[in-house]
């Protein structure tokens, strides 16, 4: 009985071993969270896309350089064939150095080309940025947690996906090699019967097919890998509701302070409106959602001017102040909306609105005159 209890306790695995580390992180990451992760060196990146694009460009460069490379080797061979008596007295190292010297230029060029290709492919995928934060020691990560390590190493979706991806690449690329070689086995077995030029052409065509289909397959793998890495990246940056609230609070400031600033702005706006509205000749309304105060003075203005405008709550304030100061209210839904959208405060009204505004002003003046 004691032995059974000991075994149960020894092999007991808590259920939270299989639960998500980020339990409760249900909110999508904000732009600020993504920017912070980028500054730390955590970016969305697919190594498979890098590999596929780099191999495609490097294979293209290789096959382009191949003809020039072959011509240089043939030139060295011809030079040594012409000077055969001298060559016979040379050491093997001296003879080989002539070939190495002609090859090294292409090797160096290919090396720097591969560095440039990888550099630019990475820039295209993640953009250009330099950060050293990922190299800084994270002392909070030193504490070893076997359950977390085992889960991330053996039971995570990333581990299974990478294992499946690696096995799939090995199997498919081996099958590509097998089928291409099998389809050309007749030509390969008779290479000794062809001329040197024909034999090289056959080998190059076979190599080209293998490279092309392998790169195409890696490109397809890269697309799926990018989609998977994107989902994992978003998942790793997900936030709790509390983190989102805290971030919004940091960005927008303390709610109490924000409400005080808003109230202060409302007081300032109301003060400005109480100065501007009494000077207006008419307030054009929507009637509920928009209000635009207009003034016209033929001696100082070339066209009527917008003194104040507002929407919703501000529109109600404008109408209230207008009533208190006996400024006429005229309802014209289309005009009120158009002036609110297209004319700024203290700007003159555009020419296309002159006719309709003049009619409203004439009507206002006639009513005011009759009232007086």
Swiss-Prot record:
Alphabetical UniProt keywords: Bacterial flagellum biogenesis, Bacterial flagellum protein export, Cell inner membrane, Cell membrane, Membrane, Protein transport, Transmembrane, Transmembrane helix, Transport
Membrane topology, record value: Multi-pass membrane protein
Chief place where the protein resides: membrane
Listed SUPFAM superfamilies: EscU C-terminal domain-like
Pfam families per UniProt: Bac_export_2 (PF01312)
GO cellular component annotations of the record: plasma membrane
GO biological process terms held by the UniProt record: bacterial-type flagellum assembly; protein secretion
Transmembrane regions: 57-77, 104-124, 161-181, 202-222
Location in or out of the cell: Cell inner membrane
Keyword Nucleus included in the entry's annotation: no
Protein family (similarity comment): Belongs to the type III secretion exporter family.
Function of the molecule: Required for formation of the rod structure in the basal body of the flagellar apparatus. Together with FliI and FliH, may constitute the export apparatus of flagellin.
UniProt protein name: Flagellar biosynthetic protein FlhB
Encoding gene, per UniProt annotation: flhB
